[in-house]
Amino acid sequence: DYASMGRIVDRIRVMAYDYWFAGSAPGPIAPIEGVRGLVDAITGLVPPEKIDLGIPTYGYDWVRSVSGTCPAEETPETKAIGTARAARTVTERGITPSWDPVAQERVFTYVDTLAGTDANGAPVTCTVDREVRYLDAVAVHRRAWLAHREDLHGVALWALGNDDELTWDGLRAARLG
C-alpha cells in the first residue's frame, strides 16, 4: 500500500528493473516505458520527494540455444553481467552493441564455443548462442533524467561495483539537466 507507506516513511526506493530476469526468456531489464509507467503510478500515491528511483548497472547474459554436447564441467547458464563487464565483453569480442529504441537499452549477441570432456572423459564441444541486454551510460542517464524531470528525491543504483566511469558521467549529466 504505497499511499499508506508514503505517509509514514521518509523515503521509498523503487526497484524499477528486472522486468525480464535470469529465469525468463531474453528481454529488457528496465524498459523505459515500464519505468515511466511505474513512476507515474507511484507519484500518484506518494509525494515525489520521497521516492528514489532504482536504476540497474547490470544486465543479463542469456543462453538462447545450445548445440552439440557441452563439457561436463561447463553447463551454459544465464547469468547477471555488470555494466563494466558487458563493456569489456564488447571490447574483447569486437562487438558493436545495438540500441533497443523501445526499451532504451543496449543489446548484443555472441556465440561461445565450449570444449572439454564429458562425464566419461570423451572429448566434446558445444556452441552456445547468447544474448546480452544491459544498461549503459546512455540508458542510465535516461532513467536518471526521468527521475530529475519528475522531481523525485533521487536515484539508487543497483549495484555499486557493476558500474563503470561512463555510468557516473551519465548520472552527472542528468543532474545538470
Located regions from the model:
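Substrate-binding surface in catalytic domains of secreted glycosidases
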Residues: 1-93
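Soluble non-cytosolic domains of exported or imported proteins
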Residues: 29-36, 134-141, 162
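Second-shell loop/turn segments in exported
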Residues: 23-29, 129-133, 157
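Glycan-binding loop/region signatures in secreted carbohydrate-active enzymes
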Residues: 57-146, 175-176
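Acidic/aromatic/glycine-rich contiguous surface patches that form carbohydrate-binding/processing clefts
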Residues: 138-177
